Amino acid sequence: MTFIGWCQIALFGAVVVALVKPLGWYMTRVFAGEWTPLTPVLRPVETMLYRAAGVDPKQEQHWLTFTLAMLLFHIGGFAIIYAVLRLQALLPFNPAEQGAVAPDLAFNTAISFLTNTNWQNYGGESTLSYLSQMLALTHQNFLSAATGIVLAMALIRGFSRASVRTIGNFWVDITRCTLYVLLPICIPYALFLVWQGMPQTLGSYVDATTLEGAKQTIAVGPVASQVAIKMLGTNGGGFFNANAAHPFENPTALSNFVQMLSIFVLGAALTNVFGRMIGNQRQGWAILGVMGVLFVVGIAVAYWAEASGTATLDALGITGGNMEGKEVRFGIVASALFAVVTTAASCGAVNAMHDSFTALGGMIPLINMQLGEIIVGGVGAGLYGMLLFVVLAIFVAGLMVGRTPEYVGKKIEAREVKMAMLAILVLPLMYLGWTAIAVVLPSAVASMGNAGPHGFSEVLYAFTSATANNGSAFGGLTGNTFFYNLTLATAMFVGRFMMIVPTMAIAGSLAGKKLVPPSAGTLPTTGGLFVGLVVGVILIIGGLTFFPALALGPIVEQVSMSAKTLF
């Protein structure tokens, strides 16, 4: 570890925090339908879209209607993605003449991008046409990201409103999010990436002659436009198989820093939106503080583990830490930081191979996902995931003092706690259940690239990543099989929607409650005590849930590596 390395981490954190308030102010006004600097340009477009779709922007929805609209929207999205992938060979913008995607792979990919997971059992440049990348994937990157933000806004309204039956209008929210938030950022962002050296073309792949005289085909395409929303929307699916480790997908140190920044910025800003909408910005800062504590611990451990290397490397006289699977142009600190950022959020993009991290270094991204990616998290999903843990923490605190739990003026009762537990328990049920099945089925075991604890970690990582809607992977696992295409798609679908439905039920329940004025017995929720309480509940619930599985994988692998019995 170096002083310069810690300075890079500190600079990243400082820039994220500096952007929280201005973006929070802007997003609050967008979803409240108030004036913004872009209103004169975009309001006519917004109004035209409502008229074309027959949507009344003043008509709000009950939580169940809101949720059903979201589900119908996703059914349509799935149909479009699947159809484009299966008909790819017949559609235009296919200069490499890619064939139709196999049914099971198309199903897996459609569910993957629908749920904001972007798990990829294929190499983009060798499997998909430009039209598939743009119409099926990039298009869905915008919509899945907007959906996450919209769902977070619905839950925020549940906390901020009183004695009402509605939590907003799904169609209005998703239109405003796409028009006013995602597109205005992604357009200049994509131009910045082109300036940094990223391709943006519909031209054919380039045939080149290397210095040795060999022929090589260089894949290009509409990369910058996809990468911009891939990062901002915490989608993560790469245009190229190597994802952000590819020089065309992440050309420079500056593009690497900005891509990490874009992964975090909207999720962090939503904590400020929460504070503004409930009338107390300190509440938002407290939630961001919980996220910050967990993030700092994670990056400290990951950076230390990768910079320290392994006992085997030390015995060979190799100094400088573990550089296996990392780009020299980024080094250890930028690779470790990217890994923690991409799994603290539900992004899943990678600029290094997580499978090549040390056992302890690779365990941190795994833990981030197993906690539910609540450390900033996916756009929207991180905030509503964190608020579920806040509900449980407030409930525990209420039990300790013998009072009905309250949070920001709303009583937390049995219905909210049951729904929160249902949403939280979905993740371990999926990733532990499918992992247990996969490690005993011969056909699934055959896909493992390694035996022993690391092979177990590969399978556990895959199902954790799918259930948490992350999409990153330990690359040693061959995922493009019928078993993994089907089971990972199931994990992605359940992990997304079985968390959303209980969350929306909580939003509807809270919106119908009266505001309770604070009293002498009300737990303060803006200070260090509250931050510590929430962190403690997260670690206790998480530790009890996934520690046994970690003990079979990365922990025993780390112990073996330290004893020089396993590299």
Swiss-Prot record:
Membrane topology field: Multi-pass membrane protein
Compartments reported by the entry: Cell inner membrane
One GO term describing the cellular component: plasma membrane
Q: Which UniProt keywords apply?
A: Cell inner membrane, Cell membrane, Ion transport, Membrane, Potassium, Potassium transport, Transmembrane, Transmembrane helix, Transport
Q: Does the keyword Transport apply?
A: yes
- Keyword Membrane (UniProt): yes
Q: InterPro entries of this UniProt entry?
A: KdpA
According to the record, the segments passing through the membrane are 3-23, 64-84, 136-156, 179-199, 254-274, 285-305, 330-350, 357-376, 421-441, 473-495, 527-547
The main location class comes to membrane
Q: Name one GO molecular function term.
A: P-type potassium transmembrane transporter activity
Binding partners and assembly: The system is composed of three essential subunits: KdpA, KdpB and KdpC.
PANTHER family annotated for this entry?
Answer: POTASSIUM-TRANSPORTING ATPASE A CHAIN, POTASSIUM-TRANSPORTING ATPASE POTASSIUM-BINDING SUBUNIT
Q: What does this protein do?
A: Part of the high-affinity ATP-driven potassium transport (or Kdp) system, which catalyzes the hydrolysis of ATP coupled with the electrogenic transport of potassium into the cytoplasm. This subunit binds the periplasmic potassium ions and delivers the ions to the membrane domain of KdpB through an intramembrane tunnel.
Q: What is this protein called?
A: Potassium-transporting ATPase potassium-binding subunit
